[in-house]
């Protein structure tokens, strides 16, 4: 966002991440503050934390959500299940979301390469009448290549299903099962790893992304 001309300040707790922010060029007292002070100064508060951290930090954020501000999320969990998380925003602010379909690291890398990562967006609450404009501007600002509309609830459930079901669940389970099966049948750790993780991540997935599964099946040697 800073590279795209937005006036960005960072709110960060003291610790290793705070020190990393300083090393990355954020200046204490100018562009780097405590979470409380950053929320007080900001007109758009971007809550870019894990689900558990959002819940723990919410009491610090909420008092600074004054009328006309925008509360921005990159994931719909806290709002979708706010009866359990306790994250209930005041009615006189905008509540918006842009959810990149990938990691923050991927988003940054693609931006530096001149590419964009697809993102979904949603508006939960439009108190100012400008929530849509704010959302689209921020979506472009973070480096989205394409934006498609969703809701907080749909984003939260699809993200959890994808990550816990396939992306962080099934894939890891399949790779581990194949690796262990090969090892049980006498294959070396190197061979088992290369026939499992290495071939998938370094060879097949780039082809899958570029050409699709029909091409993969048509060109499979086995």
What are these regions (language model features)?
Residues 72-164:
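Rossmann-fold dinucleotide-binding core
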Residues 141, 147-222:
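Helical "substrate-binding/catalytic lid" subdomain
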Residues 2, 19-22, 136, 140, ...:
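Class I S-adenosyl-L-methionine
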Residues 7, 27, 44, 145, ...:
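Residue-level detector of anion-binding/catalytic polar loops
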Residues 18, 38, 54, 189-193:
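Small-residue helix-packing motif on alpha-helices
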Residues 1-29:
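NAD(P)+-binding Rossmann beta1-loop-alpha1 motif at the extreme N-terminus of oxidoreductases
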Residues 1, 16-19, 54-57, 105-107:
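Short glycine/serine/threonine-rich phosphate/pyrophosphate-binding segments
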Residues 13, 24-80, 88-103:
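Rossmann-like NAD(P)-binding element
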């Amino acid at each position: 966002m800073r590279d795209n001309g937005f006036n960005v300040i960072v709110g960060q707790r003291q610790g290793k991440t705070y020190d990393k922010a300083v090393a990355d060029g954020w200046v204490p007292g100018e562009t780097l503050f405590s979470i409380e002070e950053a929320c007080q100064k900001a007109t758009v508060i971007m809550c870019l934390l894990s689900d558990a951290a959002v819940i723990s930090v919410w009491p610090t954020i909420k008092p600074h959500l004054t009328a006309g501000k925008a509360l921005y999320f990159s994931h719909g969990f806290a709002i979708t299940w706010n009866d359990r998380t306790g994250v209930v925003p005041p009615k006189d602010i905008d509540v918006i979301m842009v959810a990149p379909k990938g990691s923050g690291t991927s988003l940054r890398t693609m931006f530096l390469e001149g590419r964009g990562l697809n993102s979904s967006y949603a508006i939960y609450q439009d108190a100012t009448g400008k929530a849509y404009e704010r959302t689209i501007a921020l979506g472009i600002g973070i480096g989205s290549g394409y934006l498609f509309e969703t809701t907080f609830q749909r984003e939260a459930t699809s993200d959890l299903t994808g990550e816990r079901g396939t992306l962080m669940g099934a894939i890891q389970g399949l790779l581990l099962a194949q690796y262990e099966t090969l090892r049980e049948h006498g294959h070396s750790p190197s061979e088992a790893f290369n026939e499992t993780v290495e071939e998938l991540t370094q060879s097949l997935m780039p082809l899958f992304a570029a050409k699709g599964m029909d091409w993969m099946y048509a060109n499979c040697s086995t």
